[in-house]
Regions:
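Ligand/substrate-recognition segments at binding pockets and active sites
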Residues: 354-424
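Detector for C-terminal structural segments
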Residues: 31, 201, 304-332, 376-383, ...
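Structural transition elements
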Residues: 321-355, 372-379
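Gly/Pro-rich hinge or "lid" segments in bacterial periplasmic/extracellular proteins
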Residues: 72, 166-219, 224
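Alpha-helical secondary-structure segments
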Residues: 111-119, 149-153, 193-194, 222-224, ...
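N-terminal lobe/hinge region of extracytoplasmic solute-binding protein
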Residues: 39-90, 121, 190
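Surface-exposed binding/hinge segments that line
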Residues: 96-98, 133-177, 199
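Extracellular/periplasmic solute-recognition and catalytic clefts
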Residues: 141-143, 198-209, 226-289, 312
């Protein structure tokens, strides 16, 4: 029978899963190998952590290892490759980690303090545009003490630094296989994570096999995972129904989720696991473009866009309108864009443009990625185009590109207006503001605001109680609303669709909404 599971009921579901059969596999072994096939529309743009600040993390979390990470059920970083980590001073400016003993990479190299330093320094040395180097702004230097101890010296207080180290971008790599000055692009991985990457065919498949030398917190409930990458979510759903894949992650459209839930008779043997998402979608305005650089144009768009209609028509209850760059459920969330711009108001938008001397329809090109966020992205932008042109104030041209080319384009400043999605690096308001401001934001379009970068963010990072930073982030959102360099659209939900014989889906998403493949297993009857 078809059923829908909520992560809020994960404890009960986990118990039911254990009762479902005797074939649950753990790292202690089982009589038969467990192999799982997972489908997704989100293929990696790179296999090198030094270049990854995107959905490539989904694969990296499973084949690399970080010093600290998020065990299932935890929202605070805990040791993984490290035996222990802690701040050694009251100002949160020195973070010391001691490694587990006898760690090694898949090529046999020793994973010691020097390898850790090499991995982190390499991110800064390569300085890949749009990559994770922007996350290391508070890092001054990395010091090794013997083979098993590494100390991160910060240039300012940063209580979020352990969260940063827990991201797949900070994955540890084997120095012998990764150059200090160049991104690795041979389609291979040399890590120390839960799985080995046996083979990889870009945009098609990744074959993972349990790493026999892994030493970390992941209790692997399967022996091998095949990840299939689909360009269209419809093909992915068809493969699920045909038992060609066991589960899907990332890319289901709203229509597909609703169809799977409503047509129970046609979808017997399938289940949906729903997670409250912290992922957001927003527009980015590039100041290199004359129209996008005009504050009046940006504010007029903010007055015209109808989020309720967008969510209702395109996402059908699988998302909700977002009026802040910080989503619901995260400390510091406000409704600042609604408070300022209110409900859609074409007359107000026209007045703003007229006062700025704009009397003709504004011609603009909106760009979006065709494959990163699922098949609904195209109809989403068609709906935005419809709304803006219906106002009589805009003439919109739409352009779509596959993620890799799209990423190159926005990093080179080629797109005047483009859509981005953001899946949090970690569940903290800092991660919904800091990545988008400064000289090297993840959007590729420099957005310098000294009050945010030099006052508000530094003040918030001195506070170890992350629930007590709302004041700074409320002010930051006021600035974002006034500038309208970023326009939040909606906040999503995450869904895993799987065969009814697949367990672990309710535990497979970490706080970064990254799929932990090791949680999936095939149930067996008694």
């Amino acid at each position: 029978m078809f059923y829908r599971a909520s992560l809020q009921a994960s404890a009960a579901l986990a118990s039911l899963s254990l009762l479902a059969g005797c074939g649950l596999l753990s790292d202690s072994g089982s009589e038969t190998d467990q192999k799982i096939t997972v489908g997704t529309t989100s293929s990696p743009s790179t296999l090198d952590p030094a270049a990854a600040w995107d959905g490539s993390w989904e694969l990296m979390r499973n084949v690399y290892q970080t010093l600290v990470s998020f065990p299932t059920g935890s929202t605070s970083p805990e040791p993984d490759a490290a035996e222990s980590c802690k701040f050694t001073d009251a100002t949160s400016m020195a973070y010391r980690c001691t490694l587990k003993k006898n760690l090694k990479f898949s090529n046999g190299e020793k994973l010691d303090a020097k390898a850790v330093k090499y991995s982190i320094d390499r991110i800064r040395d390569i300085h890949f545009k749009g990559g994770p180097v922007g996350m290391l702004g508070s890092l001054d230097r990395v010091e090794t003490k013997g083979d098993d101890t590494v100390v991160f010296h910060l240039n300012k207080s940063d209580a979020t630094f352990p969260f940063i180290l827990a991201t797949p971008a900070m994955s540890l790599v084997a120095p012998g296989d990764y150059r200090q000055d160049k991104i690795r692009d041979d389609g291979k991985v040399t890590g120390s994570g839960p799985y080995l990457l046996e083979s990889y065919e870009g945009r098609k498949t990744a074959e993972l096999k349990k790493n026999p030398d892994y030493k970390g917190f992941a209790n692997r409930k399967n022996d091998a995972v095949t990840i299939r990458y689909f360009e269209k979510s419809g093909d992915m759903v068809s493969a699920l129904k045909a038992d060609e894949i066991d589960a899907t992650y990332r890319g289901l459209t709203a229509e597909e989720v609703v169809s799977l839930e409503d047509n129970k008779d046609d979808n017997a043997g399938l289940q949906i696991v729903e997670s409250t998402g912290a992922d957001i979608r927003f527009l980015v305005f590039n100041p290199k473009d004359p129209a996008a650089a005009n504050p009046a144009v940006r504010k007029a768009i903010a007055h015209v866009v109808d989020r309720d209609a967008l969510v209702a028509k395109v996402y059908r209850g699988t998302a909700e309108p977002l009026y802040s760059m910080i989503p619901k459920g995260i400390a510091g969330h406000t409704t600042s864009f609604f408070d300022t711009y209110g409900d859609p108001d074409v007359a107000k938008a026209k007045s703003i443009l007229s006062e700025a001397g704009v009397t003709e329809p504004v011609k603009m090109t909106f760009w979006y990625t065709t494959d990163r966020y699922g098949s609904a992205t195209e109809p989403e932008f068609e709906e935005l185009k419809r709304q803006l042109e219906a106002s009589g104030l805009f003439k919109i041209t739409l352009r779509g590109e596959p993620w890799q080319k799209f990423q190159e384009g926005f990093n080179q400043g080629e797109y005047p207006v483009f859509g981005r999605g953001w899946f949090p690096d970690f569940p903290d308001p800092d991660n919904f503001v800091a990545p988008f401001v400064g000289q090297e934001p993840v959007t590729g379009s420099p957005y310098v605001n000294k009050e945010i970068t030099q006052q508000l963010l530094p003040a918030s990072r001195q506070e170890s109680d992350r629930g007590a930073v709302s004041k700074q982030f409320e002010r930051a959102q006021e600035i974002l609303v006034n500038d309208v360099r970023l326009l939040p659209l909606w906040q999503g939900k995450l869904y895993i669709a799987a065969g009814e014989d697949i367990g672990g889906g309710e535990r497979a998403l970490d706080p970064q909404t990254v799929m932990q493949m090791w949680e999936l297993y095939r149930k067996a009857s008694w």
